[in-house]
């Protein structure tokens, strides 16, 4: 099974001082966490937040952020998932459980994982509600 890493997981993997770095990096180092996927949304989110320095790190320079993404995507086991299918199609089974604007991206990433027969890897326990019973198998909550 392929794991689509959400943006928070991507950021934590770049910040050894983050409170969840150890459990996330331990999970990521396990062979069972491979293959792993990124998509345009998670890649651009990672770049944007590294540039802002929002993780507690100093803001990355543009080339540093690009290099960080290159290193990540060059790792063995990486798969790129394009943004297909369209948003409305991928969130159709999830849409009724969405509770607000903060879940729109999560819903799409979960829908993308479902479409690709994978799992969305996240720390966000609240996403279980969004998945419902029928999509619970498509979520990997990384324990902290």
Language model features with spans:
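Conserved beta-strand segments of alpha/beta enzyme cores
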Residues: 35, 77-79, 138-140
């Amino acid at each position: 099974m392929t794991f689509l890493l959400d943006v928070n997981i991507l950021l934590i993997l770049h910040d050894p001082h983050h409170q969840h770095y150890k459990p996330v990096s331990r999970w990521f180092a396990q062979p069972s966490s491979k293959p792993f996927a990124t998509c345009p949304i998670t890649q651009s989110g990672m770049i944007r937040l590294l540039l802002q320095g929002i993780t507690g790190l100093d803001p990355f320079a543009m080339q540093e952020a690009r290099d960080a993404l290159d290193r990540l995507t060059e790792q063995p086991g990486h798969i790129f998932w394009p943004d297909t299918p369209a948003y409305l199609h991928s969130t159709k089974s999830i849409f009724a459980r969405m509770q607000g604007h903060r879940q729109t991206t999560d819903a799409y990433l979960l829908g993308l994982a479902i479409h690709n027969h994978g799992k969305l890897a996240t720390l966000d326990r609240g996403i279980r509600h969004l998945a419902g019973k029928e999509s619970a198998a498509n979520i990997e909550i990384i324990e902290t």
